[in-house]
Amino acid sequence: MKYLVVIDMQNDFIDGALGTPEAQAIVPKVVKKIEEFGGAIFYTMDTHGENYLDTQEGKLLPVKHCIYKTDGWNANLLVAGALQRKEDALVRIHGFRKATFGSAELGEQLRLRYEYARSKNGASKDSCFEIVLVGLCTDICVISNALLLKAFLPEAKITVDASCCAGVTPERHRNALEAMKACQIFIENEVAE
C-alpha cells in the first residue's frame, strides 16, 4: 500500500505571512504529484487560533499565520483543486488539522492501516507499505511528521520527495534532508548542488 502525505500546502506558507519563492516554486510539482499518485492521500493543515502569539510557538516565531478560517489558513487553490479532482475520482482523501509541527493523529491513522495490512499480508510485506511526504516546510513540519511516522511505523518505508518540498531557507531545506537521511528516511529527487 502506498500513501501520499501532503504537508501544510497553505497560503500563508506559500505566498502569505511566511511564504518564500522556493515554496511558490514547488506548487506545480506538488499538484503533479497529487494528480499522478496511485494511492490514498492524506494532508495536514497547520491550524492556529487568534491566541497564537500567546503560545510557545507564537513566542518563538512571532508571525501570525494559518489562523483558522482565514485566507492564509486555506490550502493553496491549485493544490486544493488537485485534491478535489482526486476525491471526485473516488480516491480516498483524509485531512488533519494540527496545532503543532507534527500530527500524532496522522501517525495513528497510518499505524492502524499498517497493522491492518500486516494482518492481511503478513510481516514479510513490510516493504510494500510506503508513505511519501511532500510539502512545507522541510525543516519544520515535513521533518517533524517524517520522524513521527518513523516512530509510529519503524518498518514502513518512509520517503520524502525533495523536489516537492521547500524549507524556510534553501540551506535549512538541505540540512533537514540530511537529518532525515540519518534517521533512515528515504529522500528522492534531491538536486545535487
Report each predicted region and the residues it spans.
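Active-site acidic carboxylates
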Residues: 1-95, 116, 123-126, 155-159, ...
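Amphipathic, non-transmembrane alpha-helical secondary structure
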Residues: 28-31, 35, 111, 143, ...
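Conserved N-terminal glycine/acidic-rich loop preference
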Residues: 100-144, 166-192
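Gly/Ala-rich phosphate-binding loop of Rossmann-like dinucleotide-binding domains
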Residues: 150
